[in-house]
Regions:
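FAD-binding core/adjacent interface of flavoenzyme oxidoreductases
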Residues: 1-9, 21, 37, 80-169, ...
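Intrinsically disordered, low-complexity terminal tails and inter-domain linkers enriched
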Residues: 25-45, 160-167, 239-241, 249-259, ...
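FAD-site-proximal beta/loop scaffold in flavoenzymes
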Residues: 138-162, 237-247, 251, 260-332
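Mid-to-C-terminal Rossmann-like scaffold of FAD/NAD(P)H-dependent oxidoreductases
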Residues: 2-3, 11, 309-409
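Beta1-alpha1 glycine-rich phosphate/pyrophosphate-binding loop at the start
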Residues: 2-91, 185-205
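Rossmann-like NAD(P)H-binding beta-loop-alpha module
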Residues: 153-207, 243
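C-terminal catalytic lobe of FAD-dependent flavoproteins
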Residues: 246, 262-283, 359-440
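A Rossmann-like FAD-binding core segment of flavoenzymes
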Residues: 92-109, 116, 189-292
Length: 441
């Protein structure tokens, strides 16, 4: 009989997905076991404990934007039900924080003083929003956009006539994916929203300026205001330490005097930082994240890490695709049989889709590469369609699509495979079906 207790710190998307995958794999193996030499049913016993500091476990953070917008209820975005956890030998402890770990004894200690043993320990502690260290950054009304508590706080301001105002003012710092999702959702809840962004155009890591301008026009038509090339200087507060606005300067023309935007709350969407404090505290090797190898093993025996708390090959991970792949790799690592070879984790190109109703947007590959490259461009201004494919040595380096993204999956496949497109390059923007017919003819 083999008994394994997996203890997972963090019940977010990475932790809960791994827990369920591991449980299903062990239960499947158990169902196929035969009779042992004593004539008894062979057993492969296991238990999984998920510990989460939030009062909720296993919800889809990607869907917090629709919850904020009022398009979904929070109850609809749970990844698994309580019954599913129970049926898969998974114990979930919410509102519980691991305060210390005895690595030698294979035990964790919680904030309530409980000691829990483990055979294998998995860090899935995720990340926390980065709050710009501006003057008054701890004031009431300054928040990130990461948890249900953040959503509840924003809804309280946007929907409940904050300070008696029918249309409260919300300011979002950061014009990336998360910031735009938050801004769009808050507008739908009746707030007046301004997005302050440090770069000269939105989504500057995923788009070029042409696509970004189309996107900005779309949001402006919904009532969102934008301040670009803005360098946030200080958060303004009243006598109760409640946010009243933001002071900023122009980071291009420094001769322009500082300006202030009035606001009832400030949402920071300027990136995240891996949550590694506990790992550092107990001596697990960390740099910007918890260091792991390509099988998700840390430098400490029987300790593993997956998700946004991880650093691999000097990279951090904030998208769901690599996080889920890490969970899959760890599953194989822990189920590896003697003499077998487990798959390993590697960094792959990722694609971006904006999760805002009415926006068709796709970006993949390295959009910053331009030297010695060809750019294939199609534009239809009357229908707000823009497509740009960047090619070098007859291989696609990146794709930016706005308005019509139906070929995004195909372009992404060509980027991943680095396929030679010389035979179809001139017709590439006509789409997959046309190009395949061209090659067949």
């Amino acid at each position: 009989m083999q008994h394994t207790h997996i203890l997972i710190i963090g019940a977010g998307m990475a932790g809960t997905r791994f827990a369920m995958q591991y449980a299903k794999s062990r239960l499947s193996a158990h169902s196929g076991l035969g009779i042992d030499s004593q004539g008894e049913q062979s057993q492969d016993e296991f238990a999984i404990t998920l510990i989460n500091s939030e009062p909720y476990a296993g919800y889809n953070r990607i869907m917090l934007s629709p919850v904020l917008a009022g398009e979904k209820r929070f109850a609809e975005i749970y990844l698994f039900s309580q019954e599913e956890y129970a049926n898969h030998n998974i114990t979930v402890k919410t509102g519980c924080t691991v305060s210390d770990i005895n690595l030698a004894a294979h035990q964790v200690i919680t904030d309530s003083g409980e000691t829990i043993g483990y055979d294998k320990l998995v860090f899935a502690t995720g990340s926390t929003p980065f709050i710009l260290p501006l003057p008054n950054h701890t004031a009431k009304g300054v928040m990130g956009f990461r948890t249900k508590a953040d959503v509840d706080a924003m809804l309280d301001i946007a929907k409940n006539n904050h300070n008696g105002k029918k249309s409260p003012k919300c300011l979002v710092i950061g014009g990336g994916l998360l910031g735009l999702e938050a801004a769009n959702a808050l507008v739908q809840q009746g707030a007046k929203v301004t997005v302050v962004h440090g770069a000269g155009y939105l989504l500057n890591r995923q788009l070029d300026k042409t696509a970004a301008d189309l996107l900005q026009t779309y949001f402006e038509n919904k009532g969102i205001e934008f301040v670009l090339n803005a360098n946030s200087q200080a958060i303004c507060v009243d006598e109760d330490n409640q946010v009243t606005g933001l002071t900023y300067t122009d980071n291009v023309d420094t001769s322009i005097p500082a300006k202030t935007i009035d606001s009832d709350c400030i949402i920071m969407t300027v990136g995240v930082r891996p949550n590694i404090a506990l790992a550092q505290q107990v001596g697990i090797s960390c740099e910007r994240g918890i260091l792991v190898d390509n099988q998700m093993r840390t430098h400490t025996p029987d300790v593993y890490a997956i998700g946004e708390c991880v650093q691999f090959d000097n990279q951090l991970f904030g998208l769901v695709a690599p996080v889920y792949e890490q969970a899959n790799i760890l599953l194989h690592t822990l189920n590896e049989q003697p003499g077998s070879t487990s798959p390993v984790f590697s960094i792959q190109p990722t694609a971006t889709k904006l999760k805002v109703s009415g926006v068709a947007l796709f970006s993949a590959g390295d959009i910053d590469v331009s030297h010695d490259c060809e750019q294939l461009i199609y534009q239809d201004p009357s229908h707000s369609i823009y497509q740009k494919i960047t090619v070098k040595d007859d291989r696609i380096l990146s794709a930016v699509l706005y308005g019509d993204v139906q070929e995004g999956g195909w372009f992404f496949e060509l980027i991943q495979n680095q396929q030679d497109i010389s035979a179809i390059k001139d017709k590439l923007l006509f789409g997959k079906a046309f190009c395949e017919e061209l090659l067949a003819g």
